[in-house]
Amino acid sequence: MVLNMNFIKQLFVNQLNKKVNIQKFITDFNNNIDPKINFTLNEFTPWITPLYDFLYLEPQTFWNNDIANSVFKKLENLFNKNQKEFIKSIPDVLKHFFIAYFTYKDLVEMLKNLHQLKESDKIATRMYRLPIYINLIEGCIANLYKALLKIISKTNNKNNLETIKNLSPLINAMREYNFEELCEFVDTEIRNAISHGGILLSNQNVKFFFHKNGSKCDKTLEIYQLDKLINNTLDNVSGIFVGFLRFFINYPDIINFKKYIDPNDFVSNSLLQLQFSLPGTQCIFITIQPGDTLQLNLEFTTENTKIEELMLLSMVFAILARIKLPKLKSFFITFHNERLLPNFIKYKAEDIDLILKNENEIPIVMNNIITRQDCIISEASKEEIDLQLAKFYKFPIIQGEGWKIREIADCSLEEAKRLKASLFVGEIKTKEEIVKIVQDAIKKLKTCFNPPNSCHIIKHGNIPADSIYLSVYYKYNRDKNIDLLETNPNFILYAQYNIPGREPI
């Protein structure tokens, strides 16, 4: 396999330049994170994508700079104290770092959803605020503490630090080794109250119940105070990440990326995800296809929705995968975006080899992929819709006299509004009663509002439905006894309504 490295580097840099001006990125990095370091993106670092997020995306941009500087300086001091032992700690450090980092990314998305919800503060607190805070503490901070203590343990020959698992001892150890500032906003009383169900909610405040020194205690936070606690904790966590990233950039040789190439190993998989990511297009999943296929599956979230851009991105990542994992025989790539339908493109190893030998072969390779039907990528929906409505809308439970419609789902097409649902009629009734209920239910369901679809155009809104598909049962018992089989004693019948001119299915 002949590698045209200049071509490969240029592909990557071109994709990066589409998202952010490279010189501006370096300038912003120097102005906001490290004024001294000088690096070029032609020899790209895998840390570019998380750095981009912390430089340009909210709420990541609100990272605590004092925390970031403190973490960087203390990591640097520990490294200079005992470089050999520091490097030995890196595999364990990276394990905890990535557990924290992936948790953090999920929580950032949850926070964004929290601000878009139209639920009451009470429901939003139960669904989002409390889980966000407890996961910031247990998923992010506790693992970042463990990462730091792994380094301290190795460089100071303190093996007893390796066994600390619970939050309070972790906090005590951090304070003992002068990481006091990292413990601010870590409220163990609130954490214990959430973990043990000691919560009383209203739309104005949250009351936390916990034990302290053997006594029952409580504290109350107004909703705005809880939001402030979450934001401050998030900013501190962000600062810890920036401190680590700054250290990794300054000391690139402490991580031998060539060593971490096994997608089945968590740390290797995590590092590969970073290397297969760009600002705006991030790798979220890497697996080896089970069996003897030697296929690598790569999944991405992306802001790109144009077919030609997705094809080019897929080629860039397939080339990187071929270089880093040369034993694999094929590369299956999918992209996720709220405006895209499910898609994929599959490259064979020989496709990539042909491109690497001669970049002029790209059109031929792409044509071969399309010809053998190894590619399904459709245009993104360009319909102007309320994306938040499409994302968060929940169908209601419709009730009649003695019956309920639940589990309403939208299966509409561009030319037809179609709804399917489950109808529960309650106690055993006569055939005539059941028919009457089905007719009433269809009449009600016909007028049910359906939201737009973010991926493709459908008939939607308050207009009457063209088709209704009802599965009718006696009793609702969550996911039990809802098979559409004659042997299911709870199943009664399947009913379908279509406006005149529409064929039944």
Can you name each region flagged by the protein language model?
Residues 418-479:
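Mature extracytoplasmic domains of secretory-pathway proteins
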Residues 208-260:
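Amphipathic, Lys/Arg-enriched alpha-helical patches that create a basic surface
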Residues 1-120, 259-397:
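Extended intrinsically disordered or low-complexity regions, especially N/C-terminal cytosolic tails and loops
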Residues 204-215, 331, 468-471:
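Short polybasic amphipathic segments
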Residues 124-171:
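Short, contiguous, well-structured surface segments enriched in hydrophobic/aromatic residues
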Residues 74-75, 164-205:
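Short, mixed-charge amphipathic alpha-helical segments
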Residues 397-400, 476-505:
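C-terminal partner/receptor-binding element of secreted or periplasmic proteins
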Residues 279-293, 394-425:
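Short edge beta-strands and adjacent turn/loop segments
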